[in-house]
């Protein structure tokens, strides 16, 4: 019985792909959500914002995600705490799944460089993974549908059959990612 973690991160910006994960200019994780399943049985879930500690949430990211500095300061946990809890879920999973997993896994490796060890960063990098963006693009192509398959909303509407309400909230995106993954596996 496989344990699968569906997860998503929201951040202060895009990773600087040309720079190492340990570069201080790399973005911070503003929210992590994860849902861990053994088959259809929900084993664990979490959804936390990170409290800024010397960094700001840009206005354009607040507009996109709805995460304000005020909310993050009031309801957020220290970013290291969020990272540690997320790492526990990643370690406990056999497979990790995200929509655009290169992005989310990189954000976790950036956090590992800030708060953890090189071994933790490598552990995250080596974890068995699946990407609903890649799987979704293949599915759209196989169905002869137009579109890139990059947007979570686009893939969700095409494969699951409905719009996502509240996208760019990590928990909403995790639920949508799992729905896409289940539909693709069901059709395989």
Regions found by a protein language model. Give the residues of each.
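Glycine-rich, highly charged phosphate/nucleotide-binding loops
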Residues: 74-84
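Metal-dependent phosphoesterase core characteristic of DEDDh/y 3'-5' exonuclease domains
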Residues: 2-4, 25-69, 87-188
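Short acidic, Gly/Ser-rich segments with clustered Asp/Glu that frequently serve as metal-coordination loops
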Residues: 9-22
């Amino acid at each position: 019985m496989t344990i699968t973690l569906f997860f998503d991160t929201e951040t202060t910006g895009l990773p600087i792909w040309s720079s190492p994960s340990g570069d201080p200019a790399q973005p911070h994780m503003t929210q992590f959500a994860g849902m861990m399943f053994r088959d259809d049985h929900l084993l664990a879930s979490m959804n936390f914002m990170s409290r800024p500690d010397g960094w700001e949430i840009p206005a354009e990211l607040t507009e996109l995600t709805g995460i304000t500095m005020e909310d993050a300061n009031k309801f957020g946990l220290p970013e290291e705490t969020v990272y540690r809890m997320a790492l526990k879920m990643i370690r406990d999973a056999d497979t990790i799944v995200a929509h655009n997993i290169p992005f989310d896994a990189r954000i976790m490796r950036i956090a590992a460089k800030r708060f953890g060890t090189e071994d933790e960063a490598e552990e995250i990098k080596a974890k068995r993974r699946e990407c609903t963006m890649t799987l979704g693009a293949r599915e759209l192509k196989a169905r002869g549908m137009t579109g890139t398959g990059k947007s979570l909303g686009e893939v969700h509407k095409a494969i699951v059959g409905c719009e996502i309400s509240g996208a760019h909230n990590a928990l909403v995106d995790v639920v949508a990612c799992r729905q896409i993954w289940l539909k693709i596996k069901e059709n395989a």
